[in-house]
């Protein structure tokens, strides 16, 4: 019998960060983040790592999510192969 997740346990989401265009490539591209965290935390992390204030961030090379979105919601709707793919660029890459 499988044990149910307790409400206090936090599900971790694997976020795969992929450089797009002229953006520098990170040494470590995969990270785990709590699903209850907002997407703004991913954006802030990238800004600190890249030392840039201006940054364009997309999910699955398709759209830029609202920073208030929960990471777990993005993963449940757009994640695949056990991870959420996040593309980042220093200039606008997709409309």
UniProtKB/Swiss-Prot annotation:
Keyword line: Autophagy, Cytoplasm, Isopeptide bond, Protein transport, Transport, Ubl conjugation pathway
Any Pfam family matching the protein: APG12
Record-listed cross-link Glycyl lysine isopeptide (Gly-Lys) (interchain with K-? in ATG5), residues: 95
Subcellular location(s) per record: Cytoplasm
Superkingdom field: Eukaryota
GO biological process: autophagosome assembly; protein transport
GO cellular component, one term: cytoplasm
Coiled-coil portions: none
Family named by the database record: Belongs to the ATG12 family.
Role summary: Ubiquitin-like protein involved in cytoplasm to vacuole transport (Cvt) and autophagy vesicles formation. Conjugation with ATG5 through a ubiquitin-like conjugating system is essential for its function. ATG12/ATG5 conjugate has an essential role in plant nutrient recycling.
Official protein name in the record: Ubiquitin-like protein ATG12
Native species: Medicago truncatula (Barrel medic)
UniProt lineage: Eukaryota, Viridiplantae, Streptophyta, Embryophyta, Tracheophyta
